[in-house]
Amino acid sequence: MSKVNKVVLAYSGGLDTSVIVKWLQENYDCEVVTFTADIGQGEEVEPARAKAEKLGVKQIFIEDLREEFARDFVFPMFRANTIYEGEYLLGTSIARPLIAKRLVEIANETGADAISHGATGKGNDQVRFELGAYALKPGIKVIAPWREWDLTSREKLLTYCDTHDIAVEKKKGKSPYSMDANLLHISYEGGILEDPWEEAEEDMWRWSVSPEAAPDQATYLELTYQNGDIVAIDGEALAPHEVIERLNKVGGVNGVGRLDIVENRYVGMKSRGCYETPGGTIMLRAHRAIESITLDKELAHLKDSLMPKYAELIYNGYWWSPERLALQKLIDESQQHVNGVVRVKLYKGNVIVAGRKSEDSLFDDRIATFEDDGGVYNQRDAEGFIKLNALRMRIAADKGRSMK
């Protein structure tokens, strides 16, 4: 092991990262700085301070990053209507670049020469943390204990705690799955969910009721957009993180946002994940609705063609890459006229667009009407349009080429 003087650890206060603190002190003979972020996971983060102090940590950073997370990461992603493999709203993926950024910034502030995280060697998070760190600080050293130690089970971790007098909560029995939450979503993986044929039990879901148990009366919301971002709900101005919190609550009550998928991880394996993203599900549907009347056709189609690549970059950990940054500039430029109001109806797991309006709308009812348009649209123009677009196919047919 190369010499490390000080390391900044992404610290949750849970079993894994508490063990990592002591393991780093013991195996690297270094000072450990802990960083705990509130990104809307719904748990108190302040108790992590006392836990870190008991482990001998002198420099402890606990920060509320909910607003930065929503404003600078979630909202920019939703301007692109981003989904991975047609379904996943990237709730875990989009949180990692912010944590990587703060790890590097704290390393700079404290003079640390390394960072560390609790991601395993099988998952995507190790890639996301480390790609971000190297992009922002090329010379930083990264310590990933799960790729080094032999503590390969919960039982071994608990034994290590007993041996090293680490106080952790010891829950009886094995957890049926692992959970990870932030402002945008909560995920469930592993354990009983590793069989893709087995339906997730109803009591697993934390943020939403089942569609069957949702109210029989629909809920209507009016979402106000400015430059592609929601700035108000039902006329009430809200900060980005407040928008997500409000939509999570009302969406969950109406059974919105559940997802059960098998996704392709960047590291090569297929993995089943169950997710609850009530607010994000509403945001995606509503954003597409406001774009439908404010975006030029070819610009909208260009965005749609680029979205899968943009989603893949985020999923794989390339948030800080030049290609993602370049795509973001195009996406943000496309949003300058995405202003207006979308009305949505939430009903038993469904998000139904019930109206959209904008002063920047490109929808012209004089042209679109099926009634007499007063000569605004000359239908005879369509003949030349059709003939020109058919020209290449007519030439091929004249040459005897089969179109079957």
UniProtKB/Swiss-Prot annotation:
One GO CC term on file: cytoplasm
Any one Pfam family match given in the protein's UniProt record, by short name: Arginosuc_synth
Subunit structure: Homotetramer.
HAMAP family in the record: Arg_succ_synth_type1 (MF_00005)
Keyword terms of this UniProt record: Amino-acid biosynthesis, Arginine biosynthesis, ATP-binding, Cytoplasm, Ligase, Nucleotide-binding
UniProt-annotated binding residues for L-aspartate: T120, N124, D125
UniProt protein name: Argininosuccinate synthase
Superkingdom, natural source: Bacteria
Cross-referenced InterPro entries: Arginosuc_syn_C, Arginosuc_syn_N, Arginosuc_synth, Arginosuc_synth_CS, Arginosuc_synth_type_1_subfam, AS_cat/multimer_dom_body, Rossmann-like_a/b/a_fold
Keyword Ligase: yes
Amino acids binding ATP: A10, Y11, S12, G13, G14, L15, D16, T17, S18, A37, G118
Catalytic activity: L-citrulline + L-aspartate + ATP = 2-(N(omega)-L-arginino)succinate + AMP + diphosphate + H(+)
Localization: Cytoplasm
EC code: 6.3.4.5
EC class (word): ligase
A GO BP annotation: urea cycle
Chain residues that bind L-citrulline: Y88, S93, N124, R128, S178, S187, E263, Y275
Listed GO MF terms: argininosuccinate synthase activity; ATP binding
Family according to the record: Belongs to the argininosuccinate synthase family. Type 1 subfamily.
